[in-house]
């Protein structure tokens, strides 16, 4: 993992298209701004993990449903 230090209003450039900027620092909370192309999804980690979990559940349910439908046609 790369660890970088930044101060207020400083930024980090990721590739040609993504900039992460420190917007404010209040106590133990840091607000960041992210400029990236529209086609790049950006989520908080806990939201991303929740989306992945839901997608896995949906995929599993689809396989189970297909199995049930397949056995009903026989």
Curated annotation (Swiss-Prot):
BP GO terms, sorted: bacterial-type flagellum organization; mRNA catabolic process; negative regulation of translational initiation; regulation of bacterial-type flagellum assembly; regulation of carbohydrate metabolic process
InterPro entries registered for this protein in UniProt: CsrA, CsrA_sf
Subunit structure: Homodimer; the beta-strands of each monomer intercalate to form a hydrophobic core, while the alpha-helices form wings that extend away from the core.
Keywords annotated in UniProt: Bacterial flagellum biogenesis, Cytoplasm, Repressor, RNA-binding, Translation regulation
GO molecular function: mRNA 5'-UTR binding
Domain of life from the UniProt record: Bacteria
Gene Ontology annotations for the cellular component aspect, listed alphabetically: cytosol
Pfam family, one: CsrA
Family in the record: Belongs to the CsrA/RsmA family.
Gene: csrA
Annotated localization: Cytoplasm
Protein name: Translational regulator CsrA
Function: A translational regulator that binds mRNA to regulate translation initiation and/or mRNA stability. Usually binds in the 5'-UTR at or near the Shine-Dalgarno sequence preventing ribosome-binding, thus repressing translation. Its main target seems to be the major flagellin gene, while its function is anatagonized by FliW.
Protein's organism: Bacillus pumilus (strain SAFR-032)
Gene3D superfamilies referenced in this protein's UniProt entry, alphabetically: Translational regulator CsrA (2.60.40.4380)
């Amino acid at each position: 993992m790369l660890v970088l230090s930044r101060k207020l209003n400083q930024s980090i450039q990721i590739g040609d298209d993504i900039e992460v900027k420190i917007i404010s620092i209040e106590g133990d909370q840091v607000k960041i701004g992210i400029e990236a192309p529209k086609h790049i999804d950006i989520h908080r980690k806990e939201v991303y993990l929740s989306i992945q979990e839901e997608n896995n559940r949906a995929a599993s349910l689809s396989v189970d449903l297909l199995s049930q439908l397949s056995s009903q046609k026989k």
